[in-house]
Every structure is written in C-alpha cells, then in structure tokens.
C-alpha cells in the first residue's frame, strides 16, 4: 500500500508535466481539485457519513483548503513550467522537515529532540546541495525551486493545523478542503487564465487531468487515510522517501528527464535526514525476551 501511494503521489508530478502542455497552472489545479471533490463527496455519501453544519468546521476546512491544496498545488504546478517534475518531487520531500519546525514553534507537545534537529539540519543540507547548481540545462534562477519549498512549507502548516480534525472522519475533511479550494480557485482561474480562450485540450491532456484528479488526489487521499489507520503516521514517512523515486522513474522513463548528479546527491542527503528523523533504523534492536513455557 505504501508503494501504491508513493506511485500515486509521484505520478502527480508526471501528470502535471503532460497537462501543462495545454492548460495554464490555475486552470489545471482547478480541474484537479474540482474533479477530486466530486469523487470524495461520492465516497462520503456512499459511506453514509453525516455532514457537519457547524460553521467552525467549514471555516477550518477552508483554511486547510488554502494551506493543503490552493497554495502548494499552484506553486508546484507553476514551478514545473520551469523545472523538471523529478526535481520538483525531490524538493517536495522536504515537507516533513518544515512540519517538524512548525510543530516545534506552534505546539507545546511536539518539540524537536536532538535526533530530529540533526535530521532536519541534514535534510536542509541536501537542499543546499541542490540549490548550489543550476536547476536544469539552462539558468532558470532560484524562483521555481523556491516555490516548491514554499509549497512544502504550506503543507507543513496544513499538517499542524489539520490536527484539530482528529475526531472528524478523514474523508470528510478531505472532501471539505478540496471543496473550499475549488471555490477559491474558480474566480482566480476565470480572471487570470480566462479558460474560454484556451484551445481544446488534447486526449493526452484530458487523460492526464483525470489521472491527476482521480488517481493522484481522490484515490491517493483514500489510500492515505487507510494506511494511516492501519499502519500509523510513522510508517507514512516512508512514503516521503518513495515519492521522488516514483517521480524520477516516471519522468525519466516517459518524459526523457535527466537529473544532474548534484540533484541525486541532494536527494540522498534529504533522504538521510528523513531517516535520522524517523529513527527506527538507528535504534538498537531490543534483545529477545525469554519465552516462558506454558503448562
């Protein structure tokens, strides 16, 4: 299930690269969240989950829609007009680093330990390695990769803010936030992209948008929450290691993308930082307990 989720989320960068041929960023993101919204609400109704009427819930999911959908989706999609999908996926893997820093500042119960601090520093060291070289075959500056890091920061804010929905059915929270982000994106897409002037998208673009929305968003959320319930949040950190690998395989295999050696080194350093944060590979195995024979 972890590998499946990593392929779905890694595939979002791949689908973006294809769809950007015909669609501008805001319209593409609007298609993603609006189609995903319809799928998620269908699941909510299928499971007969009660829809809250409390205004605080809807205000909360509106904030989540901005932090977890609107801001990061738009930033990442725009960045992919400048950098490869593989590099965007690598930089997006810094999300847990930002989540830890934000939780340390914003909460009293999730302070950084020495091990996690070292892991965060190592992870950002990997970012420095990546930023130390051009981000593609031509000079595109730092704006596009910085946009991905800002998206990761926004995801981190959403991760901390979203803990207030611990008692809410996760699929309901997901449907609420994609609904809110759809409503926020609609006027932006109309005013900026003027989609009625866009050419008719090709079949490959339509399929990419459907894959982006239904697989990499709606199905990915459903699978994410299933793993969270079955395996716990700590095991989901493994997905962060696997997403860039999936994106690199898809980008290199189907889009002809090539990463510089420094990008691969940077990814490895970020991965090392995440492993240090996770801590399980560094912990000493517990000695086997003697088995007391039963009568």
Locations of the language-model features?
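Specific transmembrane alpha-helical segments of multi-pass solute transporters/efflux pumps
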Residues: 8, 12-13, 41-92, 127-129, ...
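Juxtamembrane helix-entry segments on the extracytoplasmic side of multipass membrane proteins
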Residues: 21-30, 53-59, 117, 132-154, ...
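Helix-helix packing/entry segments at the starts of transmembrane helices
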Residues: 29-31, 69, 88-94, 160-183, ...
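Hydrophobic transmembrane alpha-helices of multi-pass small-molecule transport proteins
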Residues: 40, 62, 102, 115-134, ...
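Juxtamembrane helix-loop-helix junctions in multi-pass membrane proteins
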Residues: 7-37, 78, 84-86, 157-181
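Hydrophobic/aromatic residues within transmembrane alpha-helices
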Residues: 19, 28, 32, 79, ...
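Transmembrane alpha-helical segments that form core, pore/gating elements
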Residues: 40, 99-101, 105, 137-195, ...
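C-terminal transmembrane-helix exit sites in multi-pass transporters
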Residues: 39-51, 96-118, 245-265
């Amino acid at each position: 299930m972890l590998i499946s989720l990593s392929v779905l989320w890694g595939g979002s960068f791949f689908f973006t690269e294809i769809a950007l041929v015909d669609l501008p960023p805001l319209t593409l993101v609007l298609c993603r969240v609006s189609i995903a919204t319809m799928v998620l609400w269908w699941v909510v109704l299928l499971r007969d989950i009660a829809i809250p009427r409390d205004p605080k819930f809807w205000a909360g999911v509106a904030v989540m829609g901005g932090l977890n959908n609107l801001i990061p989706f738009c930033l990442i999609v725009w960045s992919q007009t400048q950098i490869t999908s593989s590099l965007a996926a690598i930089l997006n893997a810094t999300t847990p680093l930002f989540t830890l820093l934000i939780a340390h500042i914003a909460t009293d119960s999730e302070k950084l330990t020495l091990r996690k601090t070292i892991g965060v520093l190592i992870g950002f060291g990997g970012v420095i390695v990546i930023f130390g070289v051009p981000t593609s075959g031509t000079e595109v500056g730092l704006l596009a990769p910085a946009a991905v890091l800002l998206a990761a920061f926004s995801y981190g804010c959403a991760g901390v803010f979203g803990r207030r929905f611990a008692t809410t059915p996760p699929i309901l929270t997901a449907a609420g936030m994609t609904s809110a982000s759809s409503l926020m994106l609609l006027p932006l897409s109309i005013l900026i992209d003027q989609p009625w002037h866009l050419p008719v998208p090709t079949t490959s673009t339509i399929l990419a948008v459907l894959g982006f929305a239904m697989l990499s968003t709606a199905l990915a959320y459903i699978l994410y929450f299933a793993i969270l319930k079955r395996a716990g949040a700590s095991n989901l950190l493994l997905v962060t290691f696997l997403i860039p690998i999936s994106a690199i395989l898809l980008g290199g295999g189907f889009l002809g993308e090539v990463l510089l050696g420094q990008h691969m080194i940077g990814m490895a350093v970020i991965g090392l930082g995440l492993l240090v944060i996770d801590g399980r590979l560094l912990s000493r195995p517990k000695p086997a307990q003697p088995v007391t024979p039963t009568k």
